[in-house]
Amino acid sequence: MTNFGRVITAMVTPFTPEGEVNYSVAEQLAGHLVEHGSEGLVICGTTGESPTLSWDEEFQLFRTVQQAVAGKAKIIAGTGSNSTHEAIAASQKAAQLGLDGALLVVPYYNKPPQEGLYQHFRAIAQAVPEFPLMLYNIPGRTGQNLLPETIARLAELPNIVAIKEASGNLDQASQIRQLTPTEFAIYSGDDSLTLPLLAVGGVGVVSVASHLVGDQLQQMIRAFTAGQVDVAQTIHTQLLPLFKALFVTTNPIPIKAALQLQGWAVGNLRLPLVSADAATQEMLRSLLQSLNLL
């Protein structure tokens, strides 16, 4: 059984002032995250600005972070694509690098029907039969919802072992849990829904907030699994304003601004994303100060 851990950080991609990938800062940030609660790192996911990275940049990032972490956390490569051929090639290369798994987003823009989604993910799984795969359902970005019945079919494939569920629908998450084996791991794709998702059978979170509060997320999940629901609820309530603030505009704009406020040289974003405006930066500064994060 593959265990990616409870708290997985969807890591930002740092850029230099010239807009090139800053591999040195990526290395430093990865090490910091692992020291502060992250048992896994998703590299080149949504938060990592994958749409504006080249495959060469992505694979260099995979190698850089893999070397920096040195086995202390799972490295999960964002190899999803709306081209099955490209997703297969990227996943095969990630497997050859010795990474711990891949995150595969639902194909976007071309809006395949459920049978097309099933065949897409099955083709990737069959191309890398020994490589653990995590599905990624985020209909707000892809325009298509991966339905529980389709997920259940995919969970029968031995190397499709988990899902990052970011539909925001707890009924759907409950149905996924009902239809899949207990060893199939369900991760929250929304920080604000991590605690509710645990209550319906989730195991953890693929998080943005864990850049800042990874240790606290670990404490919340541990408290819940130990039956200390009131403790978990208190942590959730304390962190909820942060969870909301990090999505006040398009992710990863706020988290990059927050990291810059903490002194991390993560740089700006690549167009068409833009940096946080002054009002957002000031809101984040005030919030981080109130949470003793500055």
UniProtKB/Swiss-Prot annotation:
It comes from the Bacteria. It catalyses: L-aspartate 4-semialdehyde + pyruvate = (2S,4S)-4-hydroxy-2,3,4,5-tetrahydrodipicolinate + H2O + H(+). GO terms for cellular component: cytosol. The record marks 46, 109 as: Part of a proton relay during catalysis. Its EC number is 4.3.3.7. The keyword Repeat does not apply. Pathway: Amino-acid biosynthesis; L-lysine biosynthesis via DAP pathway; (S)-tetrahydrodipicolinate from L-aspartate: step 3/4. GO terms for biological process: diaminopimelate biosynthetic process; lysine biosynthetic process via diaminopimelate. Keywords: Amino-acid biosynthesis, Cytoplasm, Diaminopimelate biosynthesis, Lyase, Lysine biosynthesis, Schiff base. It is found in: Cytoplasm. Gene3D superfamilies: Aldolase class I. One of its GO terms (molecular function) is 4-hydroxy-tetrahydrodipicolinate synthase activity. Disulfide bonds: none annotated. InterPro entries: Aldolase_TIM, DapA, DapA-like, Schiff_base-form_aldolases_AS, Schiff_base-form_aldolases_CS. The active site is at 136 (proton donor/acceptor), 164 (schiff-base intermediate with substrate). Pyruvate binds at residues 47, 206. Catalyzes the condensation of (S)-aspartate-beta-semialdehyde [(S)-ASA] and pyruvate to 4-hydroxy-tetrahydrodipicolinate (HTPA). Belongs to the DapA family. Homotetramer; dimer of dimers. This is 4-hydroxy-tetrahydrodipicolinate synthase. It comes from Cyanothece sp. (strain PCC 7425 / ATCC 29141). The lineage of its organism: Bacteria, Bacillati, Cyanobacteriota, Cyanophyceae, Gomontiellales. The gene is dapA.
